[in-house]
Amino acid sequence: MKKLGILLRCFKKLLFEFSMEDKLLFTEAFFLTGIMRYKILHIPFDKLKKQLGKYNQESKEELSQDEYKVVMKIRNAVVNTSKYTPWESLCLVQSMTVQRMLNKRNISTTLYLGVNKDKNNEMKAHSWIRCGNVFVTGGDGGTYATVAKFCK
């Protein structure tokens, strides 16, 4: 119930305080996070990875000023929308959503998958995405060992 109240406040803010462009980005991000979450839960990873891009390749490291502005707008839309989704929208959902939204706008990205062990010696997985020289979601992977990367 608490999450619904937060979602309604966010929706009210979205309706009255944001530009039409931002409203469309937030709406796109909201629905895409749901689609990506569904894919993660219901599609075997062997099939899902084919949708992530070219395995073990990197995207270009330069961005134009216009591309940078688009990247930051999409980043903000996805990160902020992910706080209010009724489903779990963590790193992989966010990375896949950003990748899809930027790819739709002809901006290439590299999606990284990494692992490390926490203080209890438990394996932890993480996903982050880079566009140009900007780490868009998930930070720069810091302490995670990269096990796969996909360029799209």
Which residue stretches match the model-derived regions?
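Active-site neighborhoods of divalent-metal-dependent phosphate/nucleic-acid chemistry enzymes
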Residues: 83-84, 88-93, 97
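A sequence-level detector of short, solvent-exposed, charge-rich linear segments
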Residues: 30, 46-50, 54-55, 93, ...
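Hydrophobic/aromatic-rich core segments of domains that either
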Residues: 77, 96-152
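N-terminal accessory/pre-domain segments preceding catalytic cores
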Residues: 1-63, 70, 79-87, 140
